[in-house]
A protein has these predicted regions:
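Acidic, low-complexity intrinsically disordered regions
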Residues: 1-100
């Protein structure tokens, strides 16, 4: 049984840089698996990392969190990405669907 962590639209940047933004809560859950993780993106197996980036897009400094993997570049902008931990407890499973 998989554990759904979050759903969010695929950004226009993901296809260019292979980074899919995730919430701080999802990042904390994934970092518990290790900073380098097995990733399954719409059925394509890859290795990825969980990383943060400092940001000043708001008046107070903060961080944005990402899953980074080459397979993420195949995700289509505007689709909804559901990020889960697969039933094996160690693979990050990202599946995209058309928006509702």
């Amino acid at each position: 049984m998989s554990e759904v962590l979050e759903r969010r639209p695929v950004s226009r940047k993901t296809a260019r840089d292979g980074k899919h933004e995730i919430s701080a809560g999802t990042a904390a859950r994934l970092v518990a698996l290790g900073t380098s993780v097995d990733v399954l993106v719409d059925g394509i197996a890859d290795r990825g990392t969980v990383a943060s980036m400092p940001c000043t897009c708001r008046p107070e400094a903060h961080e944005h969190w990402f899953i980074e993997a080459p397979a993420l570049r195949a995700m289509e902008v505007g689709r909804v990405a559901t990020t889960s931990i697969a039933g094996d407890g160690r693979t990050v499973d990202i599946r995209t669907t058309a928006p509702r």
